[in-house]
């Protein structure tokens, strides 16, 4: 299934049904009086979170949604039936914005959660409502009220426990494929990953959801390479795995580029717990590993892990560190920098 994390939709709730003009006509009842029923209420438009979805691709092919008009009132004081609702099924983590794509309407984070986006118009009054002491046989009724019409943006922010960040070709997809059942595209060229992937990692009877987002470049927070869209997917993560490729000549610069983008993007991304790790160490000698690790530790002020997804070296240590930090963040409600021996 193709991935789409943003979509524009046009919705309209149903109009209310018209009230009826009707009079009671029965044998032996000379003056039956009015008995026109009210119109039914128009259908609503709802957003509903369902399980098993992780994309908004359906809304690329259908953008217009209109609920049904309420039924018209009938004689014998019968109210028209309510118009059928329209339900927009969305994945967990969907945010819905006004047409300006800035004003947040709702943030849907749990399966089964729903939100009414547009309320159907009320039905019109039948002629029974207009009877009074001076008008015993009113011949008027109200039309139903018009439904609401809105243009909305749907934006998906994946819900994961930990996120993988780094420059293109930092080995994020290879790491995800090695520790989960996810099958992201892996190749020896930049920007192999074009959209986020999710996988479930397991270690020591513990498990957590891991999100791999496409590589970040300078200017990502301003939308360069769609970086601002990708950064949104890690806003909900407890922990960030910041991977730096062992093949980078200047590992400190590679680290700082991504850190600068996190700070510029805002939303407290730069304050999240960070596990810094050098990937692809199977390409280095022991001496080269030591040099790059020491350089990064001086720049970050943190212990720096090293691993190889190809050889499997230190993969379990990475997962244990991630699982431990996720538990710590959840328990304490604060972010802490990882410390490894």
From Swiss-Prot:
Tree of life domain: Bacteria
Ranges of residues in domain Obg: 1-159
PROSITE patterns, per the entry: G_OBG, GTP1_OBG, OBG
CDD domains membership: Obg (cd01898)
Residues bound to Mg(2+): 173, 193
Family named by the database record: Belongs to the TRAFAC class OBG-HflX-like GTPase superfamily. OBG GTPase family.
Protein name: GTPase Obg
Organism: Bartonella quintana (strain Toulouse)
Phylogenetic lineage: Bacteria, Pseudomonadati, Pseudomonadota, Alphaproteobacteria, Hyphomicrobiales
């Amino acid at each position: 299934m193709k991935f789409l994390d943003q979509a524009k939709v046009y919705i309209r709730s149903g109009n209310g049904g018209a009230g009826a003009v009707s009079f009671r006509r029965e044998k032996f009842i000379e003056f039956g009086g009015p008995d026109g029923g009210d119109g039914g209420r128009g259908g609503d438009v709802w957003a509903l979170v369902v399980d098993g979805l992780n994309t908004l691709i359906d809304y690329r092919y259908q953008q217009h949604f209109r609920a049904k008009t309420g039924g018209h009132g009938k004689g014998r004081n019968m109210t028209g039936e309510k118009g059928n609702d329209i339900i927009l099924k969305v994945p967990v983590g969907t945010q819905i914005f006004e047409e300006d794509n800035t004003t947040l309407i709702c943030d849907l984070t749990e399966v089964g959660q729903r939100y009414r986006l547009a309320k159907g118009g009320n039905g019109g009054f039948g002629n029974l409502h207009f009877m009074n002491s001076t008008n015993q046989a009113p011949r008027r009724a109200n039309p139903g009220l018009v439904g609401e019409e809105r243009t909305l943006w749907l934006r998906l922010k994946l819900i994961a426990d930990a996120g993988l960040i780094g420059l293109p070709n930092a080995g994020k997809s290879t790491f995800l494929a090695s520790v989960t059942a996810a099958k992201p595209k892996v190749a020896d060229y930049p920007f192999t990953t074009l959209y986020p992937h999710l996988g479930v990692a397991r270690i020591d009877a513990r498990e957590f959801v891991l999100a791999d987002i496409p590589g970040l470049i300078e200017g990502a927070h301003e939308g360069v390479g769609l970086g601002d869209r990708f950064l949104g997917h890690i806003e909900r993560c407890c922990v960030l795995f910041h991977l730096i490729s062992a093949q980078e000549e200047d590992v400190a610069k590679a680290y700082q580029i991504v850190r600068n983008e996190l700070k510029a993007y805002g939303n407290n991304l730069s304050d999240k717990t960070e596990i810094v790790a050098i990937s692809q160490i199977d390409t280095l000698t022991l001496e080269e590993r030591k040099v790059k690790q020491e350089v990064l530790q001086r720049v970050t002020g943190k212990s720096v892990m090293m691993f190889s997804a190809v050889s499997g070296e230190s993969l379990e240590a990475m997962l244990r560190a991630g699982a431990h930090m996720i538990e710590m963040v959840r328990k304490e409600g604060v972010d802490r920098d990882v410390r490894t021996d």
